Regions:
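Short, Lys/Arg-rich flexible segments
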Residues: 1-150
C-alpha cells in the first residue's frame, strides 16, 4: 500500500500573524492618511500666494479620528475669501485639469462658493492651492496603503 501524509509547520505563527492583521492595517491606513494631510497642508501653504499671510496661516489639518476622517481646510472666520482664491469669482469657472478629481466634481464643489456679493470680489482669477495639493498627494496615499504587508 502506498501512502503519503502532509502537514503544516508554523501554523501557530501564521495564525498569530493574521490575528492582528486587521489592527495593523487600520494603523497603517491611519498613519498614511495622517502623513498625507500634513503633506497636503505643507504643499498648499507653499502654493498659495502670500499678501498678508492670513490665508496661508489659515490652512490647517486635522488628523484621523476613530471614524478614519481627516481633513485639510483653508479659511476661517477672518479669512472668508479662501474659496474665492481657490476657485476664482468669474462666472465661467476655469479650474485646472487634475488627475484624481474629475472636472464635474471640481465644478460641483466650486459652485458651493459662488460669490454672493459680486461687488466685493469681482473677476478674481482661479488660483488653486488646496485641490491641486490634494491631487498631487492622493495617488501617493493610495500607493502607500497598497504597500501594506500581512
Amino acid at each position: 500500500m502506498a501512502a503519503f501524509s502532509m502537514g503544516i509547520t508554523g501554523l501557530d505563527a501564521l495564525r498569530a500573524k493574521f490575528s492582528d492583521a486587521s489592527e495593523r492595517l487600520e494603523r497603517h491606513v491611519a498613519d498614511a492618511i495622517n502623513q498625507t494631510v500634513v503633506n497636503i497642508q505643507q504643499d498648499a501653504k507653499a502654493a498659495v500666494k502670500v499678501k498678508t499671510g492670513a490665508l496661508q496661516r489659515s490652512i490647517t489639518h486635522k488628523k484621523t479620528d476613530k471614524t478614519g476622517t481627516a481633513y485639510v481646510s483653508a479659511g476661517n472666520k477672518s479669512v472668508k475669501y479662501a474659496p474665492y482664491v481657490e476657485f476664482g469669482t468669474r462666472h465661467n469657472i476655469n479650474l485646472p485639469a487634475l488627475i484624481n478629481i474629475t472636472p464635474s466634481e471640481q465644478s460641483k464643489f466650486a459652485r458651493q462658493y459662488i460669490v454672493q456679493s459680486p461687488k466685493k470680489f469681482t473677476n478674481q482669477a482661479t488660483r488653486p492651492f488646496l485641490m491641486t495639493s490634494f491631487d498631487k498627494r492622493y495617488s501617493q496615499l493610495l500607493y502607500t496603503i497598497k504597500e501594506f504587508k500581512i
